[in-house]
Structure formats: C-alpha cells, structure tokens
UniProtKB/Swiss-Prot annotation:
Protein name per UniProt: Bacteriochlorophyll c-binding protein
The keyword Magnesium belongs to this UniProt entry's keyword annotation: yes
InterPro entries: Bchl_c-bd (IPR001470), Bchl_C-bd_sf (IPR038387)
Entry similarity comment: Belongs to the BChl C/E-binding protein family.
Stated role: Component of the photosynthetic apparatus. The light harvesting B740 complex binds bacteriochlorophyll c.
Signal peptide: none
Primary location recorded for the protein, binned into one broad class: other
Any single Pfam family the record assigns to this protein: Bac_chlorC
Positions bound to a bacteriochlorophyll c: 25
CC annotations in GO: chlorosome envelope
Length: 79
C-alpha cells in the first residue's frame, strides 16, 4: 500500500478482495453456462438427428432392433 492513509489502504484492500470475488464468480458462471450449452447441444443433436445431428444407439426399434426374450418366464425362475 503506497502513500495513503489507513482509510485509503483499507479501501484499496477491499477493492482488491471485491475484484477477486467478482472475477471468481464470473468464471464460475461462465463455466456453468458452458456446461449447460454443451449439454443442451448434445441433447438437441440426439433428439433431432435428422437435422444434422448424431443419433442415440438403440433409440429406435426400427433402426437398432429390440430385445427378444429367449426363455419363457417360468423357466427363468424355476429351481
């Protein structure tokens, strides 16, 4: 702290603390929006695959087929 009185030094220190807190909060909010945007983009790509996105494997029986039981239910639980 240079050249000021006690009051000025306290204000300068409080300003630095406030600046660090604001920068930290902005970084946190930025990371939150970044994650939210990436998640939303991935969901939209999977939901609307015909519009240039990817696809969820196994999301449609016509595309990926579906599970067919190989045993009768009674034989699964028989002792």
């Amino acid at each position: 702290m240079s050249g000021g009185g006690v009051f000025t030094d306290i204000l300068a220190a409080a300003g630095r603390i406030f600046e660090v807190m604001v920068e930290g909060h902005w970084e946190t909010v930025g990371m939150l929006f970044d994650s939210l945007g990436k998640g939303t983009m991935r969901i939209n790509r999977n939901a609307y695959g015909s519009m240039g996105g990817g696809s969820l494997r196994g999301s449609s029986p016509e595309v990926s087929g579906y599970a067919v039981p190989t045993k009768e239910v009674e034989s699964k639980f028989a002792k």
